[in-house]
């Protein structure tokens, strides 16, 4: 089976085209293993679509299928364009979270960056979902191991929960991340974003990704973090989101739509027996 390894700011993916009779969940676990496989945060599968130009399926490293992935969708768009599967620089992509619209910016025949319409943020507790009597779960006190944290949840394709911090301590994030992810508050689990506000136009983020763990970057996490930061008056609606490996631009428009922009790169191509 042929594959392509890609990444957006170190958030890496293996991209394959649909294969009949394959259990993609099992395949994701095998291929994403960083010791015995290719190594990646997730597996992206290219499939035909009846409602869009192309369909993207996303499987996390633990084999679970995700509804959407911001960085994954940007890698996916670059792949299908460069492979000639979709010839449009502005395309529609079917996902479990609905149809998204990546746009490729090409200079001298090379893709400079990819911008993707992430949809609109969902704040309604029951639709994130969060077990809460409040309509919105924003800046709410939650007690974990005897300590109280103020958490905010939003759905941007997938559930995200934001915690503002003054610094990034890896041991703290690795301990608290899975406790929030698997809390009974979140019936479907949640991604956890640790957010440090630098100024009104810049935030730094580290994401504990549901089914993955700490990642170098996360597109939907960048979007969720930017939206909540703006909602709470900490930043403007257009924000540079800084991850370990680089920066993503998130624009939360007045019409409630979110756009995510940044670079994506192909790492290598290869073949593997399955």
UniProtKB/Swiss-Prot annotation:
The cross-references to InterPro entries, in alphabetical order and at most eight, read: DAP_epimerase_AS, DAP_epimerase_DapF
Pfam family, any one: DAP_epimerase
Any one GO MF term held by the record is:
diaminopimelate epimerase activity
Q: What is its main location?
A: cytoplasm
Identify the pathway.
Answer: Amino-acid biosynthesis; L-lysine biosynthesis via DAP pathway; DL-2,6-diaminopimelate from LL-2,6-diaminopimelate: step 1/1
> What is the main EC category here?
isomerase
What are the record keywords, sorted? Amino-acid biosynthesis, Cytoplasm, Isomerase, Lysine biosynthesis
Site residues (Could be important to modulate the pK values of the two catalytic cysteine residues), renumbered to this chain: 160, 209
Enzyme Commission number = 5.1.1.7
Q: Which reaction does it catalyse?
A: (2S,6S)-2,6-diaminopimelate = meso-2,6-diaminopimelate
Gene Ontology CC: cytosol
**Active site: which residues?**
69 (proton donor), 218 (proton acceptor)
Q: Which residues participate in substrate binding? A: 11, 60, 70-71, 191, 209-210, 219-220
Q: Which GO terms describe its biological process?
A: lysine biosynthetic process via diaminopimelate
**Cell location:** Cytoplasm
Q: What does this protein do?
A: Catalyzes the stereoinversion of LL-2,6-diaminopimelate (L,L-DAP) to meso-diaminopimelate (meso-DAP), a precursor of L-lysine and an essential component of the bacterial peptidoglycan.
Describe the protein's quaternary organization and the partners it interacts with: Homodimer.
Q: Give the family per the record.
A: Belongs to the diaminopimelate epimerase family.
What name appears for this protein in its UniProt entry?
A: Diaminopimelate epimerase
Q: Which organism is it from?
A: Caldanaerobacter subterraneus subsp. tengcongensis (strain DSM 15242 / JCM 11007 / NBRC 100824 / MB4) (Thermoanaerobacter tengcongensis)
What is the taxonomic lineage of the source species? Bacteria, Bacillati, Bacillota, Clostridia, Thermoanaerobacterales
């Amino acid at each position: 089976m042929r594959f392509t390894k890609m990444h957006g700011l170190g958030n890496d993916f293996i991209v394959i085209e649909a294969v009949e009779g394959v259990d993609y969940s099992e395949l994701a676990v095998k291929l994403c293993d960083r010791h015995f496989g290719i190594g990646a945060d997730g597996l992206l599968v290219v499939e035909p679509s009846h409602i869009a130009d192309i369909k993207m399926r996303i499987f996390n490293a633990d084999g679970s299928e995700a509804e959407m992935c911001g960085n994954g969708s940007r890698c996916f768009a670059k792949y299908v364009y460069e492979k000639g599967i979709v010839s449009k620089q502005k395309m529609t992509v079917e996902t479990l979270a609905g149809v998204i619209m990546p746009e490729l910016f090409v200079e001298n025949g090379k893709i400079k960056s990819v911008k993707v319409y992430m949809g609109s943020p969902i704040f309604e507790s029951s639709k994130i979902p969060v077990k809460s009597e409040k309509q919105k779960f924003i800046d709410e006190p939650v007690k974990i191991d005897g300590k109280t944290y103020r958490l905010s949840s939003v759905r941007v394709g997938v559930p995200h929960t934001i915690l503002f911090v003054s610094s990034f301590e890896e041991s703290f994030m690795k301990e608290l991340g899975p406790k929030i992810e698997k809390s009974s508050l979140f019936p479907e689990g949640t991604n956890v974003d640790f957010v440090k506000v630098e100024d009104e136009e810049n935030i730094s983020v580290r994401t504990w990704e549901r089914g993955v763990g700490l990642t170098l970057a996360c597109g939907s996490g960048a979007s969720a973090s930017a939206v909540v930061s703006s909602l709470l008056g900490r930043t403007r609606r257009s924000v540079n989101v800084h991850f370990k490996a680089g920066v993503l631009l998130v624009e939360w428009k007045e019409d409630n739509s979110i756009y995510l922009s940044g670079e994506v790169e192909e790492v290598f191509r290869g073949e593997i027996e399955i």
